Amino acid sequence: MDFCAETNEVSKRKTACREALEQPIECDITLPEYLPDIQRVLKCSLTAHISSVQKTGDRVTADGTGRLSVLYMSDTGKLQCLEQGVPFSRFFENRAVEECECCVRAKTEYVNCRAVSGRRLDIHGSISITFSCYSCERKKLICACSGGGVETKSEKNEVCNMLGCSEKGFTVSEIYEIGDAKPAISQIVRSYASAVIEDTKAVSGKILIKGELTVKTLYIAETNDNELQTTEHTMPINQIVEVEKADDESINIIKLVISDLAVSAKTDAAGALRLLDAGAEIRAYTETYKSEEMSMVTDAYSVNYEIESKLTPTEIRRLDDSFTDTHLCRGRLDLSGTDTERILDMSVAGIEYNTSRVKDELLISGAIKVNLLTVSKENEISFFERQFDFEYRRREEFSGERTEFSPFITVTGSDYILNSGDTLDARVEITISAAVFSVNTVNVITDITVDSERPKKPSEAALTVYFADKGEKVWDIARHYNTTADKIISENNLEGMLVTEKCRLLIPRA
C-alpha cells in the first residue's frame, strides 16, 4: 500500500513565560552645595529606564536606572530641580528563555518624597519590571492525502502565519543648540522623547526602518523670575534590523520603544548653557508575518482500509488591518479651589487604556493623566495632578469570531487653554499603531494513519438506491456508503457537493 500525507504549518506568537518583579527604590539624598535649601517640595517623580537586556542560557538580565527628579521651591523663592539616578539590575530564570525573544518593560508604581531638613530628602518608591518571553508556536496539519483509498474533505482558508520575531537595541544621539530666541539654561526639569516610524522596507532577511526621534525638554531659564522654557528637537532614525524570512511580501509589525533617555546641558563657545546633549536608547521589536491561502483537511476516510485520524481545534489567524493613526484627545480639567492664574507647564504622566471590539468598531478607551505646574494669583507656584477620559474608535470589516488587537500608543504632543471659569482644556496628541487579527477556530486533521492490516469488506451490491432529501451533502452520503463523492456525482449527473432537491440517487460501489 502506497499512502502519503502532505502537511503544512500554521504559526503564531506565543507568550512562553511572563514574570513581574518589584524593584524598591530607597535613598537618602543630600543636596549638593551649589543648590539652595528646600523650602517646599512641589513634585518628586521617578522614571524607570531599561538600558540593557542580556540573555544567557535560561537567564535574562535587565540593567536600568530609576531617575529621580525633585522639583522644589528654595528658601530664596526660586524654582529648583534636583536629579539623581539609582541604578538597578534584576534577572529572571526560566527554561523557556533560551529559545525565546525577551522583552523587558519597567514601570513606576509609586514614589514618596519627604524633606527631612532643608538639605536632606528621604525618598521611597517602587518600580515593577516585567519580563515577557515570546516564541513562535507552530502546529502541523494535513493539507492533502494520496494512496490507500483515502478520500478527503478540505477547505481553504486565508492564514496569516508568523515567520519570526526579533529585537534590536540602538542609540540615537546629538548635540544641538536651543536657539537664539530662548534664554540660557539654568537647570533641566524634565525631558520626554517619542519615536515614530515613517517608512519600512524589507529585503532578504533585513528590514530598513526610517523614522524620527523627537526630544522635548523643559528647563528653568537663567532669569530672575522662575521662567520655564520648552525646546524641541528632531533627529532622524535609520536602522537595519535582521529578521529571518522577511522580504518584500512579508507583513512587518515594528514597535520602537524608548528604553532610556538622557539629556544634559552643555556650554557653547561663549560659555553659556545653550547646548543640549541628548541620547536615547531605543529597542526595535519586530514581528514578521506572511498571508497565504492554505488548504486544510477537515474530514477523511478510506474506502479500502480502516483509518485513525486526529481532529484538532486549530486557531486560524487572518490579518484584517495594519495601521498607524494620529488621534487628538480632548478633556476639560477642573481647577476650582486652586486659585490658578497661569500655567507654567502641562505634561503627560501616563495613559491607562483597555481595548474591545464593539460591533463593527475597534474601541480604545481609558484615561490620560497629566501633571500641571501652576502659578496662583498670589504668585505661588503649585503642582497638581489631573486626568481625563478618552476614546478612540475605528471602523473595521472583521472576518473572524473574535479579534486580537494590541495597540502601541505614543504621546506625540500636548497643549492647553486656560479658561476663565477655573477650568483647563487639555489636548493630547497620540499616535496609535496596531495590527488587527481576526481569529477563527477550525477543526482540522493533524494526523492520519491507514491500517493496512484491517481492510474493509467491499459492498456486495454494484449499485445501491438512496432517496436523498434536499440539502444533504454528497460527502456525508459517500462516507456512509463507503464510496467516493466523485462517483456519486458522476453516476447521477450532479452539479456539486450539495443535493439541490429531493431525489433518488444511485450509489456505486467504490
Show which residues each predicted segment covers:
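Interfacial loop/beta elements and low-complexity acidic/Ser/Thr-rich segments
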Residues: 1-458
